[in-house]
């Protein structure tokens, strides 16, 4: 039985995907980055070439519609998170969203309401806050 491979499409080619979360996607077992998107096509092309990613786009809908992409990572400015998340879910793709999930409560509600119409996985990146606490300061409250 073959394992299912998550074939990621990144929407956003900034610092987060270059140095923080992005590199991990290519190191995790059964995870592969197959496409990236930036509104600046030259930036997307360079990013893809430097990292051995086979496809690049300058239009989010084209990346979302790519049949090889089976999950979408959204690492854009927060003002576009809700739009890209809903576009991805409409295409039937699970979504992993950088924090914050959206910029308003209403946008968060729109994202959360969508999965009720279908079965979806929506996940937002959250820092492990316990790591930020000084050692020995956890009181159990």
Where on the chain are the PLM-derived regions?
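N-terminal Rossmann-like dinucleotide-binding module
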Residues: 1-51
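Hydrophobic residues in well-ordered beta-strands that form the structural core
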Residues: 17, 57, 97, 122-124
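Short amphipathic alpha-helical segments
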Residues: 21-23, 45-49, 84-87, 109, ...
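Short helix-capping segments at alpha-helix termini
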Residues: 28-30, 91, 117-120
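Beta-loop-alpha module in the N-terminal Rossmann-like domain of NAD(P)-dependent dehydrogenases
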Residues: 51-114
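A contiguous active-site-proximal alpha/beta segment in oxidoreductase catalytic domains
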Residues: 102-141
């Amino acid at each position: 039985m073959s394992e299912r491979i998550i074939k990621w499409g990144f929407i956003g080619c900034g610092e987060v995907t270059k140095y923080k979360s992005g590199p991990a996607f290519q190191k995790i077992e059964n995870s592969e980055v197959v496409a990236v998107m930036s509104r600046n096509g030259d930036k997307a092309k360079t990013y893809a070439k430097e990292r051995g990613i086979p496809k690049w786009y300058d239009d989010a809908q084209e990346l979302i519609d790519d049949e090889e992409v089976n999950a979408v990572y959204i690492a854009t400015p927060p003002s576009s998170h809700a739009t890209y998340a809903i576009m991805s879910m409409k295409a039937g793709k699970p979504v992993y969203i950088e924090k914050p999930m959206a910029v308003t409560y209403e946008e968060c509600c729109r994202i959360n309401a969508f999965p009720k119409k279908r079965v979806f996985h929506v996940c937002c990146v959250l820092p492990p806050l316990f790591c930020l606490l000084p050692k020995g300061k956890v009181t159990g409250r």
